[in-house]
Curated annotation (Swiss-Prot):
Residue stretches spanning the membrane: 22-42, 97-117, 123-143, 153-173
Purpose of the protein: May be involved in the degradation process of specific misfolded endoplasmic reticulum (ER) luminal proteins.
Cellular component terms per the entry's GO annotation: endoplasmic reticulum membrane
Protein species of origin: Zea mays
Top-level taxonomic group: Eukaryota
SUPFAM superfamilies given in the database record: Rhomboid-like
Membrane association type: Multi-pass membrane protein
UniProt name for this protein: Derlin-2.2
Tissue expression remark: Expressed in roots, stalks, leaves, immature ears, embryo and endosperm.
Length: 249
């Protein structure tokens, strides 16, 4: 069993493995009280006035306490991060890293701007960690790249992957969870998808071209990946209590 887990871990692509490792280490460290979540959460005042710049990164690494919900989040993170890195971004590690960096920037910007708008500022002030939103962004981008994959919600009904983010959002509403996390991830994912996939087809220009200094950090081969219209890829488990599995083709 241990050997199988080790092999599974070693076979992960570099970005997925690094992010998953950082998330697990951070959450375990907080659970064991080695570090405190109060030193990790997003606080614009502390970032600007006290130069605690690390909060811009650490708020994406903490997934709350270790419980069943945490395990589902880690499964979701590992699955969709890996699917994107190995398929849509195969041979383009720098582009994938830039996607995550762009998504994190958009999410942070939304929270900062929302915190300055009357009537909704209190809602955004309660958003301390954006790790779940970044994971949801990856789900959204994956669904846009694989819209025709057939999926099943707990065997109750089937749908195509294009509707996966909306199914998960509906489940959050059904169980009474906050939908802000999902909505922020969907917004960031759609902004990225539009600028990277839709806008270039409309204008011939690519505004999100990965900077050369980021490309220099990764040794990639140029690989063109053909995406099949249908593939046996499931959604895994929903945050906390939901299973979404592929429908047999």
């Amino acid at each position: 069993m241990a050997q199988a887990v080790e092999e599974w871990y070693r076979q992960m692509p570099i970005i997925t493995r690094s992010y998953l490792t950082a998330a697990v280490v951070t959450t375990v460290g907080c659970t064991l009280e080695i570090i405190s979540p109060y030193h990790l959460y997003l606080n614009p005042k502390l970032v600007v006035q006290h130069y605690e710049i690390w909060r811009l990164v650490t708020n994406f690494l903490y997934f709350r306490k270790m419980d069943l919900d945490f395990l589902f989040h880690m499964f979701f993170l590992a699955r969709y991060c890996k699917l994107l890195e190995e398929n849509s971004f195969r041979g383009r590690t720098a582009d994938f890293f830039y996607m995550l960096l762009f998504g994190a920037t958009v999410l942070t910007g939304i929270v900062l701007i929302g915190g300055m708008i009357p009537y909704i500022s209190e809602t955004f002030a309660r958003i301390l960690f954006l790790s779940n939103s970044l994971t949801f962004m990856m789900v959204y981008v994956w669904s846009k790249h694989n819209p025709f994959i057939h999926m099943s919600f707990l065997g109750l009904f089937t749908f195509t992957a294009a509707y996966l983010p909306w199914v998960l959002l509906g489940f959050s509403i059904l169980v009474g969870s906050s939908t802000w996390v999902d909505l922020l991830g969907m917004i960031a994912g759609h902004v990225y998808y539009f600028l990277e996939d839709v806008y270039p087809r409309m204008t011939g220009r690519r505004p999100l071209k990965t900077p050369s200094f980021i490309k220099a950090l990764f040794a990639d081969d140029n690989v063109v990946v053909a995406q099949p219209p249908n593939a046996g890829i499931g959604a895994g488990a929903r945050f906390g209590a939901i299973g979404v599995d592929p429908q047999a083709q």
